[in-house]
């Protein structure tokens, strides 16, 4: 199973969006790895959103869609309006 996830840092007031097939391991690397690029700038990252996807391709396309929006408001609206997540899953269902 693939997961699209969004982390939030209050210190930076920034979101990080990614996807993975091993969520627990990926989160571990975000918090503990020496090779972190973006998430090393803060130590207060929290899980903001986690979406389960049907395939790797669906997860990649949803991640790309969210990043392309370049909007904190859009990401906040994913929580505020769960139907947006449903529509993304449907839009990229058979990709």
Where are each of the predicted segments found?
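GIY-YIG nuclease catalytic motif and its immediate N-terminal context
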Residues: 1-36, 40-50, 60-67, 78-95
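A common structural junction motif
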Residues: 69-71
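Short, surface-exposed polybasic/aromatic micro-patch for ligand or macromolecular engagement
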Residues: 53
């Amino acid at each position: 199973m693939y997961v699209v996830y969004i982390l939030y840092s209050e210190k930076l007031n920034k979101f990080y969006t990614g996807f993975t097939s091993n969520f627990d391991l990926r989160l571990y690397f975000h918090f503990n790895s020496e090779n972190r690029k973006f998430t090393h700038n803060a130590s207060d990252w929290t899980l903001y959103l986690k979406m389960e996807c049907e395939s790797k391709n669906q997860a990649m396309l949803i991640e790309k869609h969210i990043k392309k929006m370049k909007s904190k408001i859009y990401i906040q609206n994913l929580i505020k309006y769960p139907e947006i997540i449903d529509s993304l899953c449907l839009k990229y269902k058979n990709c």
